[in-house]
Amino acid sequence: MSSLPVAAVLPELLSALQHAPQVLLNAPTGAGKSTWLPLQILAEGNIAGRIILLEPRRLAARNVAQRLAELLGEKPGETVGFRMRAETCVGPQTRLEVVTEGILTRMIQRDPELTGVGLVILDEFHERSLQADLALALLLDVQQGLRDDLKLLIMSATLDNDRLQRLLPEAPVVVSEGRAYPVERRFSPLSAHQRFDEAVAVAVAELLRHEQGSMLLFLPGVGEIQRVLEQLTERVAEDVILCPLYGALPLSEQRKAILPAPAGKRKVVLATNIAETSLTIEGIRLVVDSAQERVARFDPRTGLTRLVTQRISQASMMQRAGRAGRLSPGICLHLLGKEQAERAAAQSEPEILHSDLSALLLELLQWGCHDPAALAWLDQPPAVNLAAARRLLEALSALDGERLSAFGRKMAALGNEPRLAAMLAAAQTDDEAVTAAKLAAILEEPPRGGLVDLGAVFSRQQANWQQRSQQLMKRLARRGGQPDAGLMAGLLASAFADRIARRRGQEGRYQLANGMGAMLDADDALGRHEWLIAPLLLQGSASPDARMLLALPVEIGELIAARPELAKSSDTVEWDEAQGTLKAWRRTVIGQLVIKTQPLAKPSEAELHQAMLNGIREKGLGVLNWTPEAEQLRLRLHCAAQWLPEEAWPAVDDASLLASLETWLLPQMNGVHSLRTLKALDLRQALQDWLPWPLRQKLDRELPTHYTVPTGSRLAIRYHAENPPALAVRMQEMFGEATTPVFAEGRVPLVLELLSPAQRPLQITCDLSAFWQGSYREVQKEMKGRYPKHVWPDDPANAAPTRRSKKYS
């Protein structure tokens, strides 16, 4: 084993770990960094405490743990153990734990000091998964504030060293050149005249006919794997075994794919990018690369994820090609042109830039971090995705202002995705808890095969769901209870209320409570139900409507009876412009779905006024009578908040005024019963009465409506939301004014638009003194010739102002 490439840099690495808190290791696939190096660090690294090795994928974690234990002549659970979702194999003597990403985050949250841990190794960091970025940010925070003795080793096959070194400028970089056999890289675009699955199968069969050895075929997703597998069944020889490999396969099936082919056989492993790194698949010397991958991209506008098929990066192509040279010289056939490959992005985009960040935000708030920018990230989480995450957590009642609510803390402690955590935390009885646990297990690993009816799926017994359900029950500290299908709708509604759906028309089309559209296949039996709740949705690329992947029929009356907080009643108003009247209605809604509408026959004045306010909020402030005087007062208040921020000026933007109608408009509405009388309201008076007397006085003093110029003329000042105040005045009327007037306690100069006798602009200035002493001379010279009957003195700052020409002066 010492012949492994990474062995050559072991002394350098061990020295770096002794002298630096963070170390970067760049070692290509097959160098031994996952399956050999951790044992050497354990034996020779003088690490004070356990070692945690993070592997992104469950299959890789299990295999790495198995391999490391075998090298010690042991079984997992002794010196080497592993932890992953729904399965733990560690013992009292375990000193090296291989864990998956979510597990590491939970360990840090439960014990921020990582008591008893001396080193954390982040493997395959180049994949830049969301959880790996979060783990790095948390670990750096732990090192800085709690454990300056904790060591961190970041290792990868294609480290983005420049970015990491900017983040960790003091970290030593250890580079292992690796040992790969030569790989012949071929490039051949697929035929445009064949279906993708058929064209891939033809290319694979052709390569198998001319070359020996087993093959690894990279495809973007499960659908392509299944279709290409069908095509290959008829095209390959009898000695070829076809093995699918993707993350949703049961681990037992995944392990079959990576075992050596039986004697006299060879195999084709049809894999997603799960096989790019970590996994060693025995006997592979041929790789066919579709050069495509399927990526989940979150849409913060809809709150849904869309699966996008895209070209892989050049780094991923290199990784895939490298799989052909692990054991002997090999061949990699890329199914695209060489020029196309050279135009591909150099590196894959990190998950944090295009993912749903609600789970990350929940973790950060549990950590006590209210501003993500306070942590060290390779890429800052996008603000728009964080805003969408915050909206979801608010809808789930997880927040109390900027912090987690008591319910949010209960959610965070469970360690599940936020919606599932909310559903689990909402369970009150043992029966509800076990029902929620089974639902969560199903939604984490949904069945394949196209069955959408969640009720039918729930009735199934599946070992992985049962195992996961039991683990979740332990987290909830619950025992006993029986799964009850009758509780499903209420539990789902506690986390997916925005995905309650009502049928619209035929052919499986529905509207969701969040206003979006959703659909089933036209022949799906669920389509006969008027109401569904669809916890699992996927945003399609061909239609604006989301596709329901799992949905449950609900009786809406029973659901509201079980969860009355879902339904909101509101009084709204309809404007009858022709009659000048208002019609008030009471609507009962779930989100944007109207359950019931009833007229308010004889509403009281208070009810009618509230309905009017709701109508104004619905239609906007434009339905009110904004006179120039009212608009000017609103602008002055806006400017006062900017120029005199130390005072508590009321906010007058649209959103704030709509939110505070009861405070400033309602007191003026006595006797208002119709649209005509509503539009007659004096909004200037309403806003002025809203101001406390001291602020009203200060506004009139510091931001006056008019300014009296030297001639005595009282001229209106123009206020603007983004610019200083302005005054248009004939230049002769400003003679004798030496300096520019200032407002807002001397902080804001008045912009003077100095006009000719014909009221045309001559000069715009906010420094009158400089103008009189400077460019006025040129204006004077020109104006004397054009307006000889008017006064153009040599010393305007001290001259007498006038409204008239020389004849009348």
Language model regions located:
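Short, isolated positions in well-ordered beta-strands
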Residues: 181, 518, 714-716
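C-terminal accessory/binding modules appended to enzymatic or scaffolding proteins
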Residues: 686-748
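Acidic, serine/threonine- and proline-rich low-complexity intrinsically disordered segments
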Residues: 399, 432-517, 530-706, 745-809
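Charge-dense polyanion-binding interfaces
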Residues: 121-122, 240-241, 250, 254, ...
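P-loop NTPase motor module signature
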Residues: 1-423, 483, 538, 722
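Short capping micro-motif at the N-terminus of alpha-helices
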Residues: 520-521, 585, 717-718
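Extended active-site and interfacial segments that coordinate phosphate-rich ligands
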Residues: 111-126, 290-294, 303, 315, ...
